[in-house]
Structure formats: structure tokens, C-alpha cells
Amino acid sequence: MKKFVFSVCALFAAATISFAQDVNEATDYFNAAVEYLNLGDKATALENFQKAYDIAKECGEAGQALVDQCESTIPQLALMVAKDYVKAGDYETAVAKAKEAAAIAAAMNADASVAEAEALIPNIYMQQGNTLLKAKDYAGAIKAYAENVAINPSNGKAYVNMAACYDKLGQTDKAEENYLLAAANGQEKAANKALGNIYLKKALAANKAKNFDQAIELANKSISFNETSKAHYIIGLAAQNSNKLDIAITAFEKYLELDPTASNAQDVRTVVDALKKAKK
């Protein structure tokens, strides 16, 4: 019986010594993490804080103070690491680190940090898209914007930019589709202006190809999104060339109303007068 009691005491003593050693090891990792953080090496600091945390959690009450300190530090530090990758332009790694930060924060019940990390992810995709758009990598930008709206489907600005990329690639159907989504999500003014320009270009091309009825139709479509003097002028030209005098007169007069100081204003007035005389 005495031997058994002795053995149990020895076991508790060994456990106490083990816990003390583990807490010391956790403390060493924690202190190393602080040093790395002071040196600006956030990634290595995070690794050491995580090691300190994992060890301290196994030490029960003896490691609780370290656990608390780690839990108040690690979630925000993980976010800072992700943001550093954003600043460096390494967007793929930034997204991976932001997802990792969200998972870490969730495991530590740091709800505010979870929300911040999750909100960061679509912003990273948006910034990536903007960077690629500026670099004229339109296909890459479309991919990034698509990732953004998959998470945040009400981001009208992403649809505007994605539509602009499709337009640059000559995919006007896709451009129109995304401009309409942009208009439905708070970007109506920018989207309608862009849609007006798309149909204005189509109307110009149709008029140049002597497809006058199509030119009139497309110019009217342009006006339905964004009224411009140029669209009315194209209608006037196409209608004049297809002997639709009433339409031509109305369109040219609207052109002069919208742009009375146009360089060709006097010539257009002369044409209008001639068309009116031709009707008599």
C-alpha cells in the first residue's frame, strides 16, 4: 500500500515538473515571438505565438495566462500577415492567409476578427482586379472581379469594371450583361453611360456599313441608356440616307438643341432647311 501511494506521489511530481517545463517552453516561444514582432517579422512572430499557444493549452491552469495573451494577439496578427501580402501585391497568398486568419480567429472565438478576415477576402479580389485592369490584363481582371462578386454579389463597382474588361476584349454581350448588373446594384449612372457608348459604337459601324435601319435602331438604343448629341446625329445621317426625312429632321434638330455650338452646327442647319424644303 505504501509503495502504491509513493508511486502516485511520484507520478504527480513528474507531471508537475513536466507542466513547469512545458510552460517554460511556451514562454520561450512567446518571448521569441515578441522579439520577431519587434523586428517587423510578423510571419515568424505568428508561428512562434502559435507554438506557445499550442503548448500552453496543454498545461492547464499553469499555462492559462499565456493562452489568454496568445488569444488576444494571434487573430489580429494573422490578419496583419494577410494584409502585408496584399501590400506586396501577392494576392493569391493574401487570400489564403486571410482564410487562414478567419479559421484561427474562429477557433479562438474571436468573432470580430473572423468578421474582419472574411470581409478582407472580397476586398483583396477587388484590389487584384483593379491592379490587373490597370495593367490591361483584362482576362485576369475579370477572373478576380468574378471572385469578388461571388462573395459580394451587390458590388456594383465590380460589375462596372468587369463589364469594361469584357468591352475591351470585344465581348460586348458579356459587357452589356455586367453593366445591367451594375445598374441594378447602385451604379446606374456609370453603367448607363457605358451602355450608351457601346450602342453608339455599334450604330456608327452600322451607318458606315450603310445598314441605315440598323444604325437608327442602335442609336435609339444608345439614347435609351444615355442621350447624347452624337447618337441623334447618327440617326439624322442614317435617316437622311434612307430617305426618312421626318426622322432625319427631328434627329438633326435634337442634335442642334443638345450641342448648339458644335463645329458643324451651321452645316447641319443648312441640311435641315434643305430637308424641310424637300418635303414640300
Regions found by a protein language model. Give the residues of each.
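Short coil turns that delineate tetratricopeptide repeat
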Residues: 23, 57, 106, 153, ...
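Helix-start (N-cap) detector for alpha-helical repeat units in TPR-like alpha-solenoids
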Residues: 26, 60, 68, 75, ...
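Register position in tetratricopeptide repeats
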Residues: 38, 76, 80, 87, ...
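Canonical positions in the second alpha-helix
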Residues: 52, 101, 148, 181-182, ...
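Canonical tetratricopeptide repeat
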Residues: 65-69, 73, 80, 120, ...
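Alpha-helical adaptor scaffolds
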Residues: 122, 184-224
